[in-house]
Amino acid sequence: ALGDKVQFVEQNAANDIPTCATIVNGFVSDGVDLILANATPALQAAVAATDSIPILGTAVTEYGVALDIKDFNGTVGGNVSGTSDLAPLDQQAAMILELFPDAKKVGILYCSAEPNSVYQSDVVKAELEKSGVTVSVYTFADSNDVAAVTATACDENDVLYIPTDNTAASCTEAINNVAEPAGVPIVAGEEGICKGCGIATLSTDY
């Protein structure tokens, strides 16, 4: 069995970006043979730490955005490869319109520190606006202002959309505690967020 020949070292940064860097730098110092980076912050930390140790990304939404690669064609190159969990954004936008045909205002809620979320927001916003829906974007810097930003978004919109977003995923309880009493439904970009505070999603099956 592979486990008899390979030593696996698992470290959890708990969605803290500085901790990602600390963990990855430790891996580099230890001379590991491969780094598996789960989610965008971990991938970014790994790429910043080494250009020689092979890196595999997983649950990374959009590599071109995450690694600031212009004209990204699907191949990162160098020591980096991996898989993407990018959802069908056009179909998510269509689902919002199908579920809420009378909605006039849709708010998009995400963490401003996550470039993948910005990308998803831009795509979904453009798709919704094609149908004449007014779309407003609401961003929080970190978990500390999630509740306040969610409250503002709920006050001003008929429906909310939250893309695949690591910070939002860790704050679904806080988001739900605001949105549910306000009676504002949330369509989520991925399954975890949907389970925590959403009513529907169309996403990657993890």
Residue ranges and their predicted role:
Residues 1-8, 126:
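Short, polar/charged alpha-helical segment
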Residues 7-29, 139-155:
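Structural motif
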Residues 12-70, 165-180, 184-189:
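Beta-alpha junction/loop-to-helix N-cap segments that form part of ligand/metal-binding clefts
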Residues 33-35, 104, 158-159, 198:
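Conserved acidic residues
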Residues 60-62, 85-88, 111-116, 141, ...:
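Short coil/turn segments
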Residues 66-97, 195-206:
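Short beta-strand elements at the ligand-binding edges of bilobed clamshell
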Residues 81-129:
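An alpha-beta-alpha
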Residues 115-184:
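Pocket-lining segment of extracytoplasmic ligand-binding domains
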